[in-house]
Structures are given as C-alpha cells and as structure tokens.
C-alpha cells in the first residue's frame, strides 16, 4: 500500500509491505508515484525471501501498481487486487499504516528521512508485541514461520 504525504512537501511517499500471517512489515521510501521505481523497490525488497513469505501480494488499484504483470513474471508470485474503494479487503496493511503514522504523520517531510530512518520505523513496528500474535512480535513470528518452513526448529535443542 502507498502512504501519501502533504502535496506541498513533494511527491515522495512510502510503500508498506505487510506479511499477512506474522504482520512483519517492510517500509520503502519512494521519490514519486511512478510505477517503475515503486515496483522496482518492492521487487528488490522481496525477491530473496523464501516463497512462503511471498506466496501472494494484494495491491490496491493505485496507478503505481500498473506494471504488476512484469513484477509477477519476475518473482512468480500470485497477485491480487482489491475492489475499488474497499480498504477493508486489506485490513492488516491499513492497520499497519495507521500504526506507522505515529512516526510518519501526513505533515512530515519524508524527503528529509534517510533509508536508515525508514528502516528504524519498520524495526519498531516489527519489534512491538501484538495481542493478535499472542503477545509475540511480528519479527518473532516471521522468524518462527521461516525456520519451520525450512524444517528447522526456531528454538535451540537442549
């Protein structure tokens, strides 16, 4: 999903990617809404993840996602689209965006933020325990799921 900021602060925006099961979040800073840079950053962020972490991606109907066929062909991930004006169809990402707005309010000039600053915000989101995860953090659940998929226990053997 794309998070926009005040127009007078330029075209810079952020894309939020949220893994549905663990709520693990990646936030990416974009210079504008053009599809090539936005989709390029998403591809770079997820291409090395195990397939379980990118089985499908749900986009909204924004123009920044029009190059989805090339994206899907490059990583072999099923893509879905929400119905127009239906944010409840991607409630997890909308909730995550609301959480991220604590650090990224609409009035913030994100052009001043570095990629490191953006990563710190993702880290805060990923290291905050969530009731829906049994008070585990998204990072813990994501790690457990990835290790389980690879056939390893997330906990050291005694």
What are these regions (language model features)?
Residues 1, 17, 23, 42, ...:
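Mobile genetic element proteins and their domesticated derivatives, centered on retroelements
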Residues 3, 21, 31, 62, ...:
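Anionic group-transfer/hydrolysis microenvironments
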Residues 6-10, 15, 27-51:
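Active-site beta-loop-alpha junctions of metal-dependent nucleic acid enzymes
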Residues 22-24, 49-54, 103-104:
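Short, surface-exposed connector motifs at secondary-structure boundaries
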Residues 47, 70-77:
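Short, surface-exposed basic-aromatic patches at helix termini and helix-loop junctions that form
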Residues 59-72, 81-104, 111-123:
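RNase H-like two-metal-ion nuclease catalytic core shared by retroviral integrases
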Residues 23-28, 81, 106:
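Short small-residue beta-strand/loop micro-motif enriched in glycine and branched aliphatics
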Residues 106-158:
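C-terminal domain-tail junction helix/linker
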């Amino acid at each position: 999903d794309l998070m926009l900021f005040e127009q007078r602060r330029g075209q810079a925006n952020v894309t939020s990617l949220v893994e549905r099961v663990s709520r693990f979040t990646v936030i990416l800073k974009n210079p504008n809404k053009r599809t090539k840079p936005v989709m390029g950053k998403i591809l770079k962020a997820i291409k090395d993840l195990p397939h379980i972490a990118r089985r499908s991606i749900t986009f909204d109907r924004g123009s920044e996602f029009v190059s989805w066929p090339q994206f899907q062909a490059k990583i072999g991930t099923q893509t879905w689209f929400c119905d127009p004006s239906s944010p409840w169809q991607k409630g997890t990402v909308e909730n995550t965006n609301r959480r991220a707005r604590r650090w990224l309010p609409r009035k913030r000039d994100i052009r001043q933020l570095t990629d490191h600053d953006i990563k710190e915000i993702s880290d805060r989101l990923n290291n905050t325990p969530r009731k829906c995860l049994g008070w585990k953090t998204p990072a813990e659940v994501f790690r457990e799921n990835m290790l389980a998929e690879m056939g390893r226990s997330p906990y050291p053997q005694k």
